[in-house]
Amino acid sequence: AAREIAKQIGIPYYVFDCSKEYEKIVLENFKEEYLSGRTPNPCIRCNSMIKFDVLPYLAKKAGLEFDKFATGHYANIEYDAEKARYILKKGINSKKDQSYFLYKLKQKQLENIILPLGKYEKSEIRKIAKENGLAVYDKPDSQDFYNGDYNELLEVKSKKGNIVDISGNILG
């Protein structure tokens, strides 16, 4: 879909293979945290370490020049001149706000990012896409960081056994 949109609006489309970094930084960490009994949020790690760090680095390394890096996150970034720092703010659409997923971004990252969707409701974006003939106007929302089988990712094998309560009583 992204390739089609880029062609449709007349901008270059590039692909960078970040799969090794994603495997090491996001998936391995997710697996370690999950199997240690914690509930990781891989999107936060992916945003701060892959999307806004590895990806811009690879683009610049490939000779692409850009002042700002734009994504489709529903959040806003404002510059506070008094404090001389960038502030991450919620998007206006409280149901689709994604500022939480970006909270680990550093000042240098925030300085180089544009989040054009943060000032719109999702329905407005879909309407704009439809009016401009973009095929993604009715595309379902993406929700997951991994499109495979979680058991395979976590290397969890089902085991036969009794179902027990917290006191150790066999329930079935």
Give the residues covered by each predicted segment:
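ATP-dependent adenylation/nucleotidyltransferase module used to activate substrates
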Residues: 1-103, 124
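AMP-forming adenylation/ATP pyrophosphatase catalytic core
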Residues: 70-77, 81-172
